[in-house]
Regions:
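Inter-lobe coupling/hinge segments of SF2-like helicase ATPases
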Residues: 2-334
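C-terminal or mid-to-C-terminal helical accessory/interaction module adjacent to the motor/catalytic core
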Residues: 337-338
Length: 338
């Protein structure tokens, strides 16, 4: 925070990368920088790669700023036309203080009266040209803060983001424990299921994530529908309740399942990467990632960040078919070391 405050108060244009694991407090830092910007008479915007993440930021920041006389709006692909027009007009006349959104912020029609701060979350999900487009929304370039949960070695950060200063949040919030990361093969599935059963008996909850919704002839990966059947056989009603969440579900059904899990009404959530962001369940202590070789490092980090949000000992289990490729070995090592 001191580094960023110094940048903002220096009279020069800030260009900074903020790196910190999921749940380390990046949103809080972003909020404080926004308040500095607003206090000096500027508007601020925050761009996220998905509607779920943008909505999560909007909900969090709205709660935090509820007692302040500030106007916060959200603009995404699903924003209705009338609301969209109102937001466009309010941005230009300066009555919106903070705008949160997705790629919708990049549209030509989105113009600000006095943009002083641009924040980009999960910046690696956006191209350089896209980020630059956001920064050109003002006559004078705004201060820029880009955030990532994926650990980037400092030498690599200098290579890819040489124009950015780097700040690292290397501490977890008080009471938060580091998530243990292990890998297991399909041959150990019975032991993994037994571990899940033991955790549920202790009062914990479990995520099981799949790369695909349905079986594919082209891709030899575990799929969610098949997995859901085998999990409900192994963990049957009435002793166990299992939620299922994927991208083809209607938003209301998805929200219902997510809320049931968040309230502790179900013990297991079987899902695709839609739960990569936007789900905060402190009681969840186990994350099982099926066909882990299918996921990139940033996705694995985000998924692992869904557990370990309370004070329980938590574990992330990466499931593989059999032999590990060199790439898989490298990813596991990076995850275990971070």
């Amino acid at each position: 925070i001191k580094e960023i405050r110094k940048d903002v108060g220096s009279g020069f244009h800030m260009n900074r990368l903020l790196q910190g694991d999921v749940g380390s407090g990046k949103t809080l830092v972003a909020l404080l920088v926004m308040l500095i910007s607003i206090d000096n008479g500027f508007q601020a915007c925050l761009m996220a790669p998905t509607e779920i993440l943008a909505t999560q930021h909007y909900t969090t920041l709205s709660k935090m700023l509820s007692k302040m006389n500030l106007r916060i709006e959200i603009l995404t692909g699903s924003t209705k036309k009338a609301k969209r027009t109102d937001i466009h007009e309010s941005l230009i006349n300066g009555t919106i203080d903070v705008l949160i959104g997705t790629h919708a912020l990049l549209e030509e029609v989105v113009q600000f009266k006095n943009l002083g701060l641009s924040i980009v979350d999960e910046q690696h999900r956006f191209g350089v040209a896209q980020r630059a487009k956001l920064w050109k929304k003002n006559t004078n370039p705004p201060h820029v803060l880009v955030m990532t949960a994926t650990p980037i070695p400092r030498t690599l950060a200098m290579t890819f983001y040489g124009d950015l200063d780097v700040s690292v949040i290397d501490e977890l919030p008080p009471g938060r424990k580091k998530v243990k990361t292990v890998h297991r093969f399909d041959s150990s599935r019975l032991q993994v299921f037994q571990f899940i059963e033991d955790e549920i008996k202790k009062g914990g909850q479990v995520y099981i994530v799949y790369p695909l919704i349905e079986e594919s002839e082209k891709l030899d990966y575990k799929d969610l529908m098949d997995g859901y059947e085998s999990i409900t056989r192994r963990f049957p009603l009435p002793d166990y309740k299992v939620s299922i969440v994927h991208g083809k579900m209607k938003p209301e059904a998805k929200d219902y399942e997510m809320n049931a899990f968040a309230k502790g009404q179900t013990q297991i959530m079987v899902a695709t990467t839609v739960i990569e962001v936007g789900v905060d369940v402190p009681n969840a202590s186990v994350m099982v990632i099926e066909s882990a070789e299918k996921f990139g490092l940033s996705q694995l980090h985000q998924l692992r960040g869904r557990v370990g949000r309370g004070n329980k000992d938590s574990v992330c289990i990466l499931m593989f078919k059999s032999n590990l490729s060199d790439n898989a070995k490298k990813r596991i090592k990076i995850l275990k070391d971070s």
